Swiss-Prot record:
Keywords: Carbohydrate metabolism, Disulfide bond, Glycoprotein, Glycosidase, Hydrolase, Polysaccharide degradation, Secreted, Signal. GO terms for molecular function: alpha-galactosidase activity. The lineage of its organism: Eukaryota, Fungi, Dikarya, Ascomycota, Pezizomycotina. Its main location: secreted. This is Probable alpha-galactosidase D. The keyword Hydrolase applies. Pfam families: Melibiase_2 (PF16499), Melibiase_C (PF17801). GO terms for biological process: polysaccharide catabolic process. It catalyses: Hydrolysis of terminal, non-reducing alpha-D-galactose residues in alpha-D-galactosides, including galactose oligosaccharides, galactomannans and galactolipids.
């Protein structure tokens, strides 16, 4: 399975984000944490609201956990500047003024966050509030003079060519130059100010924002609806490897505590934001004259293990490992310091059930300790798989310690030995194949011939230390007759055979397209797969059974305007074998270039996800890729199809 995990993680399009230049202002070495007024109070903050919620950060024990940046979002300013051109605050809403607000926050041991806009007006106008466009140098100095510690910088009223509309998701030019100007201005004020780029994911900012700011919003606003969690995670997929110390992909503010989500939904929301290393910005009313956060939601925000995953010194985001669209769950995972691993199994169905994590799906075979964070349980000696109950829309969040890489089976952990017979259990096979490579490590040098029997019914003799065996997709046992004691075995899955889209025939609207560049590894793809069209070919396999397919796809259907409704940043893709029931995969975004200005507009960027398919016969098999069910609430067209690797 190690090969498969590497295949999925090192897709040709997924080059390291660390290759790009990065700002180094000494801030946000771990993701910033704090509170922002927008999610609950919208653009109607006032001094009493900000002060009471800031005080609550301290009183509720949140500040000591790291929630320190307090930001007054839109609604604080006025339509005009002072006669000298300086920004000012709404004196009715903030009678003490912003410098006094900064002093108050600093006295509490908190940090003062201000909000501005790269356009002519702030978001939330009217009533009009002046923005920073063409006044960046002056405004940066003003923020510094007020004692600001961070600036959230928005993107409304910013496109000159279209007369500065409130929102333009397809601006005439990239937002980048406006953010470069403010970034440079902040660098010259002589005060460290954390810079939060908030241009809603336009022009794929992961390629340029890390050079300018400490975080960048990956997409449009989170909305008070459960579906926005799926939409946001789909947009996060191509962003995760750009994150690192000093620069973080911002999934937007938290809705935990606003009475929008159930408790399991809040746990899922908080867990995924944390392990993807998003800034953790509370968007709830913690305490004001009318409202206070519930104890249950407060406990979610204060969960120290989850905060620890977010603030981990290694600074590596979790990434999507595998998705089961028909079954309604998926797995995310990433490394932590101390050779630990964090894993999240999301239950997208709104029903309680047991879900199983196969450790090889996250590159592991064994964990000495598995800590279930929300389940508050600890399991030791986890071999190959872990099963737990999870609530509807909840998440199994695990910290794995003392792990071994996938494919490695030490005898003392996996084998039961009697005399010269050892039976290894919990042997994982991602696919049914007679081409698994078995390597034996003996306790001392040996050239003996051993006899191996697998649970698939195969018996083979191997001379030396390695040979091929047959395994069936799922859990297997291997019995070895031997004279020399065995220390461990190593099993490597088949590399399989790659079938490019060019060997597939197309029907209906589907058509082959040559890419100007990209579309790795073949330089072409099949697009326009409607619910009434498909791509088909015949593929020969050496064994019957279930086969693992690593599918190369492209999707850059970015949800901007549609994000307020049912936009999901996903596209449907189905595969069927020998006219069997199709397996559906709702793929996330793969685009890693600008959706507006790059030559391919992100539609040349390949990503890979795997599925297990049944119904394969020995010999020739009819394989069909399509968009079955695409008419039922999905995008008109399927994800573009580049090719597929069949592990046989």
């Amino acid at each position: 399975m190690e090969f498969i995990v590497s295949l999925l993680l090192l897709s040709p399009a997924l080059v390291a984000g660390s290759l790009h230049s990065r700002i180094d202002n000494g801030l946000a070495r771990t993701p910033q944490m704090g509170w922002n007024s927008y999610n609950y109070y919208s653009c109607s903050p006032n001094e009493a609201i900000i002060r009471s919620n800031a005080k609550a950060l301290v009183d509720l024990g949140l500040a000591e956990l790291g929630y320190r940046y307090v930001t007054t979002d839109c609604g604080w300013s006025v339509a005009d500047r002072l006669p000298n051109g300086t920004l000012t605050w709404n004196e009715t809403l903030f009678p003490s003024g912003f410098p006094a607000m900064g002093e108050y926050l600093h006295e509490l041991g908190l940090l003062f966050g201000v909000y501005g806009d790269s356009g002519t007006k702030l978001c939330g106008s009217p009533p009009d509030q002046v923005g920073s466009l063409y006044h960046e140098e002056q405004d940066a100095k003003t923020f510094a003079e007020w004692g600001a510690d961070s600036l959230k910088y928005d993107n409304c009223y910013s496109d000159a060519a279209t007369n500065y509309p409130n929102v333009n998701y397809e601006p005439s030019t990239s937002p980048r130059p406006r953010y470069e100007i403010m970034s440079s201005a902040l660098a010259r004020v002589g005060r460290p100010i954390l810079f939060q780029i908030c241009e809603w994911g336009i022009d794929f900012p992961a390629l340029w924002a890390p050079a300018l700011g400490n975080s960048w919003r990956i997409g449009n606003d989170i909305i008070p609806a459960w579906r926005s969690i799926f939409r946001t995670l789909n947009q996060a997929v191509p962003n995760t490897d750009f994150a690192g110390p000093g620069q973080w992909a911002d999934l937007d503010m938290l809705y935990v505590g606003n009475g929008v989500f159930s408790l399991p939904e809040e746990q899922t929301h908080f867990s995924l934001w944390a392990i993807l290393k998003s800034p953790l910005t509370i968007g709830a009313a913690l305490k004001d004259d009318d409202t206070s956060i519930s104890q249950a939601s407060l406990e979610v925000l204060k969960q120290k293990d989850v905060i620890g995953f977010n603030q981990d010194a290694l600074g590596v985001s979790a990434s999507l490992k595998r998705r089961w669209s028909d079954e309604g769950y998926e797995v995310w995972s990433g490394p932590l310091s101390g050779n630990r691993t964090v894993v999240a199994v999301i239950n997208w169905r709104n029903e309680s059930r047991d879900l199983t994590l196969d450790l090889p799906d996250v590159g592991l075979q064994y964990a000495q300790v598995a800590r279930n964070i929300w389940g508050k349980t600890v399991v030791r000696d986890v071999r190959t798989s872990y099963t737990a109950g999870v609530a509807g829309h909840g998440t199994i969040l695990l910290e794995l310690q003392g792990t071994l890489p996938s494919g490695l089976y030490p005898a003392k952990i996996f084998a039961k030995s009697t005399g010269q017979r050892s039976t290894f259990e919990s042997i994982y096979a991602a696919t049914t194949s007679a081409n698994y490579e078995l390597a034996i490590t003996f306790s001392r040098p040996s050239t003996e011939t051993v006899t191996i029997t697998t649970s698939s019914g195969q018996t083979v003799s191997i001379s030396g230390k390695s040979g091929r065996i047959a395994l069936t997709a799922g859990s297997n046992t291997i019995t070895i007759q031997h004279k020399t004691p065995i220390e461990s075995i190593q099993i490597t899955p088949p590399t399989g055979t790659y079938y490019a889209n060019t060997v597939f025939n197309v029907t209906g609207s589907a058509k082959h397209t040559t890419c100007g560049s990209g579309c790795s590894p073949v330089g072409s793809k099949i697009g326009y797969l409607s619910p009434t069209s498909n791509a088909y070919t015949s593929i020969s396999t050496t064994t019957a059974g279930s086969k693992y397919l690593a599918i190369d796809y492209i999707n850059n259907e970015v949800a901007f305007s549609s994000s307020w409704g049912w936009g999901s940043n996903s596209r449907n893709l189905t595969v069927s074998v020998n006219d069997g029931a199709p397996v559906r995969l709702e793929v996330p975004l793969s685009g890693r270039h600008s959706e507006l200005y790059s030559p391919g507009k992100g539609w040349w960027d390949t990503a890979t996800l795997g599925v297990l398919t049944s119904g394969w016969k020995k010999g020739e098999n009819k394989v069909v890729f399509g968009n079955e069910g695409g008419e039922d609430g999905f995008q008109t067209y399927a994800a573009d199809f580049v090719g597929v690797r069949v592990l046989d």
